[in-house]
Design a protein with these regions (language model features):
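Beta1-alpha1 glycine-rich phosphate/pyrophosphate-binding loop at the start
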Residues: 2-76, 161-164, 170-188
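FAD-binding core/adjacent interface of flavoenzyme oxidoreductases
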Residues: 1-9, 76-164, 182
């Protein structure tokens, strides 16, 4: 991984989401070597994924380079890789680009969509946790709206312009509002 040996204790943080970068920033006040690892070289500002999905923002507007988070701090490093295994016995991680020993390990890899055991929703729903997923949703929305404009059948138009949202948390509510706004402003 090309991380220099150091007399400092090494903290390895797996995950560059909110928890991972918040911890990395807080550790700047301590005398430690910090290695931030993520499978992407950017942090996704997830509260605005609905804006990407509805075309309000471009993906680059909610992606922040992880290297900038730790830039300028001595003994702070970022590595773009996927962790394949954690060897707690030997205090090391095994990744696609090599092994790395740690004194402290923090796993901050975020959350997964919980379907609460509903297999039907799990099979048919589109999650919105990442930028690529938001872009896929945007493509579907725009394709449906374009087909609706061309349709002469009112029932078909209605079906193409309506979506089922599962989840009424902040993201679901924001997405519902943005979809209603799109439908009203763009297609009327």
């Amino acid at each position: 991984m090309n991380i220099p040996n150091s007399p400092l204790r090494r903290v390895v943080i797996i995950g560059g989401g909110f928890a991972g970068i918040t911890l990395a920033k807080q550790l700047t006040r301590h005398n430690l070597q910090v290695v931030l690892i993520d499978k992407h070289n950017y942090h996704t500002f997830q509260p605005l994924l609905y804006q990407v999905a509805t075309g309000g923002l471009e993906a680059g507007s909610i992606a922040y380079p992880l290297r900038k988070v730790i830039q300028g701090f001595p003994d702070f490093y970022f590595r773009l890789t996927t962790v394949k295994e954690i060897d707690t016995q030997n205090q090391k991680i095994i990744s696609e680009i090599g092994d790395l020993h740690y004194d402290y390990l923090v796993i901050a890899t975020g959350s997964k969509t919980n379907y609460f055991g509903n297999k039907e929703i799990e099979r048919n729903a589109m999650s919105m946790k990442t930028i690529p997923q938001s872009l896929n949703i945007r493509s579907l929305i725009l394709e449906n709206f374009e087909q609706a404009v061309l349709s002469k059948d009112a029932n078909e138009r209605n079906a193409l312009m309506n979506f089922v949202l599962v989840g009424a948390g902040p993201t679901g509510v924001e997405l519902a509002g943005a979809l209603a706004e799109m439908k009203r402003a763009i297609l009327q």
